Swiss-Prot record:
Organism expressing this protein natively: Teredinibacter turnerae (strain ATCC 39867 / T7901)
Alphabetical GO biological process terms: methylation; rRNA processing
The protein's name in its UniProt record: Ribosomal RNA large subunit methyltransferase M
Active site: 301
Catalytic function, reaction form: cytidine(2498) in 23S rRNA + S-adenosyl-L-methionine = 2'-O-methylcytidine(2498) in 23S rRNA + S-adenosyl-L-homocysteine + H(+)
Subcellular location: Cytoplasm
A Pfam family recorded for this sequence: RlmM_FDX
Enzyme Commission code: 2.1.1.186
Lineage of source species: Bacteria, Pseudomonadati, Pseudomonadota, Gammaproteobacteria, Cellvibrionales
UniProt KW keywords: Cytoplasm, Methyltransferase, rRNA processing, S-adenosyl-L-methionine, Transferase
Length: 350
């Protein structure tokens, strides 16, 4: 049996390392099969029942590099063009009939690549026919998953309904606001969607809150804060978009982001400074030790090598300082869809 996990193309090694660690924490051991640039990793495990237990126990929102995932019996090759459904249906029955009686629905996934996107129409077509052949029950805790790699190869599998990303495949469906000064604005919006439940936006992202944006220019992240009717100190030596400055909600502080300290604690700190991740993590920890914010969203620009280990080091760096300070907190990281060679962190002080 295999755990198939999708990721950003180029981060297969990081995903493989994360899967090894996460499954081992839950007493499941196996080995990853990963190839650079394919956009997914197969984690092979001997005991299928244990793997199903594991995917049901791991908290999906705590994973960093996993965009989406499911359990499968392995890729099926040689799917005939005149009947792709039967081999997929047969493997589903053989692999899961002893563990899962029904699924609530069948999801259609594609690898986030040009080749994967080109298969989306075929996946929907095959999936619509396959769905009618599967044992469906709306009350089931499991979902079926179909992922085609080509016209003749693909996966059929299952995943728990409650261990899912907000968007299928982890591909955030957000519309770029024309008024925003840069496309980086979508990173902060996606971060809020990922880290903050929709039911809590009105209280945790409330009008008249005070915020600081470090590395603000030209104002992509500041725009999101202003759109939530917050008052923002935009900290950057570079110029801000003039339209952002017209409404009176933004104060431009032309100083270095690492040197700035707020005169009073604020509700939100956001930071998209391009610097060494350890330096950014150190700054976030300092702000947290001083209780200068309630919540923070920040980006860590990752090095070319040992990127997974760098995330772990930065997490430990922040956590050790918070534990020493006796602070109650929640810290999470995620490589969002709109992230590139980076991950986004969220720190909530309690």
């Amino acid at each position: 049996m295999e755990l198939v996990a999708l990721c950003r193309t180029g981060f297969e090694k990081e995903l493989a390392a994360e899967l090894v660690d996460v499954t081992a924490t839950h007493g499941v051991h196996g080995y990853p099969k990963a190839r650079d640039g394919q956009g997914y990793v197969q984690f092979v495990v001997d005991d299928g029942a244990e793997l199903l237990r594991c995917i049901n126990a791991v908290v999906f929102d705590e994973l960093v590099f996993v965009r989406d995932w499911f359990v499968s019996a392995g890729a099926i090759s040689g799917l005939p063009a005149d009947d792709r459904v039967s081999p997929l249906q047969n493997q589903f029955k053989a692999a899961f009939s002893g563990h899962i009686q029904e699924v609530a629905d069948l999801l259609f996934l594609n690898v986030d690549s040009n080749e994967g996107k080109a298969l989306s129409k075929l996946t929907r077509g095959v999936g619509s026919h396959l769905k009618r052949q599967l044992p469906l029950a709306k009350g089931s805790d499991w979902l079926g998953v179909l992922l085609l790699l080509s016209g003749s190869e693909g996966f059929i599998g299952v995943c728990p309904r409650r261990q899912r990303p907000r968007w299928a495949g982890g591909v955030a469906r957000l519309k770029f606001p024309r008024e925003a000064p840069s496309r980086a604005t979508l990173k902060l919006e996606e971060a809020w969607h990922h880290f903050i439940p929709a039911s809590e936006w009105d209280t945790r992202l409330a009008p008249s809150m005070k915020a600081v944006d470090l590395g603000a220019a030209p104002g992509g992240w500041t725009w999101q804060l202003v759109a939530r009717s917050m008052f923002v100190d935009a900290v950057d030596n570079g110029p801000m978009a003039p339209t952002l400055m017209e409404g009176g909600q933004v104060t431009h502080r032309q100083v270095d982001g690492f040197a700035y300290h707020p005169p009073k604690p604020v509700d939100w700190l956001v930071c998209d400074i391009a610097d060494k991740p350890a330096r950014v993590a150190d700054m976030i920890a300092s702000w947290a030790e001083n209780s200068w914010f309630r919540e923070a969203v920040f980006n860590l620009k990752l090095p070319m090598k040992q990127r997974y280990k760098e995330v772990l080091r930065c997490r430990e760096q922040i956590e050790l300082r918070l534990l020493a300070a006796g602070r109650d907190y929640r810290l999470r990281f995620k490589q969002l869809y709109h992230d590139r060679e980076e991950v986004t962190g969220h720190l909530e002080l309690r």
